[in-house]
UniProtKB/Swiss-Prot annotation:
InterPro entries named in the record: Aurora_borealis_protein
GO cellular component, one term: cytoplasm
PANTHER family recorded: PROTEIN AURORA BOREALIS
Region of interest (Disordered), ranges: 362-381, 584-607
Protein's UniProt name: Protein aurora borealis
Lineage of source species: Eukaryota, Metazoa, Chordata, Craniata, Vertebrata
Domain of life: Eukaryota
GO MF term (any one): protein kinase binding
Underlying gene: bora
Keywords, in A-Z order: Cell cycle, Cell division, Mitosis
Family per record: Belongs to the BORA family.
Pfam family, one: BORA_N
Gene Ontology biological-process annotations: cell division; regulation of mitotic nuclear division; regulation of mitotic spindle organization; regulation of protein localization
Function in brief: Required for the activation of aurka at the onset of mitosis.
Amino acid sequence: MGDVRTQLTPETPGRAAILNPFESPSDYCSLHEPFVSSPSVFKPSKSAATPQQFRWSIDQLAAINPIEIDAEDIHRQALYLSRAKTDKETEERRQKAIEEFFTKRTIVPSPWTQHEGKPAAPFHSTKCADLIHESPVGRVQAVQSGKSTVGCQTHLSLPVDFNLEKVLGEYFRAEETADQSQDNLSSSSLRRKLFLDGHASGSECSSPSSPPQEGPYYDPPAALGVLCSIDLSPVRCRSPTQTPSSGQFSSSPIQGGRRAFSLGSITSPTFLEKSPASVTSPSFSPIAINLGKTPDAEQKRLIFPSPETLSASTSMVNAFTRNPYIEGCSPIKSIFQIKSRSCRGNAPHRTSLFQIPFALEPHSDDKENSPPSSIKSPEGDLSSLFHQLENIVPDGHVMMGGEPIVSPTVYMQQEYLQSEELKENDTVEMVEPVEIEEEHSWPKETVATDNIPMASFMTGITFSGESSHMCMSPLAESSVIPCENSSIQVDSGYNTQTYGSCIMDGIGAETTYKENDTHISDIQNKCQHFKVKDISSVDCKNQLLEPESPEFQHSTQKSQNKLARYSLNSGMWKLTGDGAINRLNKNGGVQSPPRTLNPKSLSHFLQ
């Protein structure tokens, strides 16, 4: 053990080694390694010394040295206290001291008040104070630094019992107008505010009211007053600077191109339906916007693949993939070229093929604003179109391998012939969609009519119109369109509205009025009839892509000055009237269904 102890070197020189009795001597060799000390090493020691001063508790003192209290002393003390309360001078002196203490001295200091007799704390150090006194601006700031203006009392003092209406009535009296009737309350309701313009409006939106009384807090209202206070409509209304004549929306029917704007029971005169060229009204009706009456219709004319303007656009098929609900609230968009002229009597008119429900949107803004180059006068356009089509395909159909290819010229010529024959019957039932297996297939069941369906541009729904026959959307299932008196009534799921003055203005369709002039008579003399034959899609595609081949030229010479009739699905068009049925039986019976026609080949053929 002695040898082991001599080998140990304490960490601190001159300090005796502390041996732990709980450790064995064999562990001394590992003391230089870190280890966990035992609890006995850091145990605090208690000192046995007594405190310097000792005090007995109250209970201990009472038990050690008890004191006897005499009853006379208690009675004498009570008598003294009773006499002291009756002394008025002493009581007044005490109350005066109490009032002086609470009135002249602040018990709870307020940061808004300046205390008297209390020196202001220095805001700056000694060096800063010297600089302030040297500068004249600093001296002014030093004087004003300890002052503050705080309002602690109201200008109007109210007594305990007061009449609030009498005191505050002249300051908070609402300005009442003369016409506070039920009519104004109904017109200013939330339902009416939804259709009002929040910014401002013209005088056509509301009837003239009496001028309000002027008051001290009178604020001049806007033109609509209460009616145009809040704009709660989710659809942005047109501002009065943009629409000087067209007011707000109304549910009143259209009467001869004029609309009577009404708000509740407040009536107002009718105004013409016109809008500036820079802004178009939003579409709230299932029937599309009338492009014929708006001034911007002359500048913005969209191109649609009609028989006249089929070759004017090259991006028609891609436009159908867009969302039909991008513009406006109506799923129906009518995009046609509008050609109008004076109509004599019951002159026939023709509608172009159009697509529903997809809207046709050009890709560029320049094409929308600029008029198409293919629009001409009806006489010059038709004559030049017939001339071009006759030069391309002089025959009514081309025979190749036993399958005919029908020329669009024949369709145009026969359309004029049938327009004269079908004038007396102007009623067409609702168009039904055709279920197809492929994207560009023709319907299987066919019936002989006088129209050509553009199935390649319709994606399953084929519509056509000629003479006075109209085509409506499949959404309006209960629509009946009498076209004799130029009036239609449409129930499209939103509401029922009656439109007059012109059929084509109601649906925005392309309308071409034609006169019985010498040009039509010349076309009728050149036209001949012959039977309908099947159209082969393969032969049609090959023949259209190679119009200059010898076989094409040979076949066109055989079928010169002939006219073909087309076959349509019986479920797509339903002609009512004995005259139409008799003409169908006279011209030809039901033929075999035509085959698939490629849209690219047809567009290339017409170009």
